[in-house]
Amino acid sequence: MRLSPRSLCAAVRAAWRESFPLEGRDVARWFPGHMAKGLKKMQSSLRLVDCIIEVHDAQIPLSGRNPLFQETLGLKPHLLVLNKMDLADLKEQQKIIQHLEREGIKHVVFTNCVKDENVKQVIPTVTELVGSSYRYHRGEHVEYCIMVIGVPNVGKSSLINSLRRQHLRKGKATRVGGEPGITRAVMSRIQVCERPLMFLLDTPGVLAPRIPSVETGLKLALCGTVLDHLVGEETLADFLLYTLNRHQLSGYVQHYGLGEACDDIASVLKRVAVKLRKTQKVKVLTGTGNVNVIQPDYPAAARDFLRAFRSGLLGPVMLDRDLLQGRSAEES
């Protein structure tokens, strides 16, 4: 008996993993000296700061934010900017906002700083927050000093540059990178607006000294907030594949022309490597000596898989969907 396409898809999904093996995995800590120093410098600069803008990745709105920020940066007015909204599936945006409100986060703006989407909301929101708060030790200064904080590689520098484009018609003032750790020290003030006169302090990305769970660590790593090799590129690619299949997102199938979804990372990476012509020579010892064998370059395929995800080529993804639905990978 032949199965209908729908029945066939259901049968394939039934064979997919229901959970990702997290036991025994030790997500490496990425808390080098410049992170600890950066947090101390932020604290020492607080006296001059009117408001805190915390930037985080919109794909993980409920995961990976550094709890030390709340503890060390005190009662300053706070705006959470969820950046890279173009990469996130925001069908449940209202649920995200409600979840954050329960955590005490009352002011949230979703942005895409690369294309300046929603960035115009930031300065009016900050101005209102500062205007309704007591400006400790600031006297009658008319300018605003805003500190931009967040974990690595979420778009803090991109936000500053976007604000300058929007309000000053000027270009980059701070370097932007696709890897964590580009901004190494608390920088001098950068003007982003004339009216009101507003300066921003760009700061280095600071992760929590301890990532609370392996699942959170993997999500952070997928978003590029820790260096891939600390977790393992093929491990990250496998977690990404598991997540996409579990959410029934088949963008990777179309992007790589795979024909059908698959839950085996070795098989997927092999097909990706063949399609991209990513191969490597490997010496194999035989009875007649060493023989060079051409094999798929699995690490190169994994890197391309991750790059495609981070570039939005696999479609928008909400990595915290389980948390929004009250589940985690360990429970599912």
UniProtKB/Swiss-Prot annotation:
Entry annotated with the keyword Cytoplasm: no
A single GO BP annotation from the record?
A: mitochondrial translation
Keywords assigned: GTP-binding, Membrane, Mitochondrion, Mitochondrion inner membrane, Nucleotide-binding, Transit peptide, Translation regulation
GO cellular component terms, alphabetically, are:
mitochondrial inner membrane; mitochondrial matrix; mitochondrial ribosome; mitochondrion
- Hey, which family's this protein in? Belongs to the TRAFAC class YlqF/YawG GTPase family. MTG1 subfamily.
> What name is this protein filed under?
Mitochondrial ribosome-associated GTPase 1
Q: Which domain of life is it from?
A: Eukaryota
Where is it mostly found?
Answer: mitochondrion
Q: What does this protein do?
A: Plays a role in the regulation of the mitochondrial ribosome assembly and of translational activity. Displays mitochondrial GTPase activity.
Originating gene: MTG1
Q: Where in the cell is it found?
A: Mitochondrion inner membrane
Source species of the chain: Bos taurus
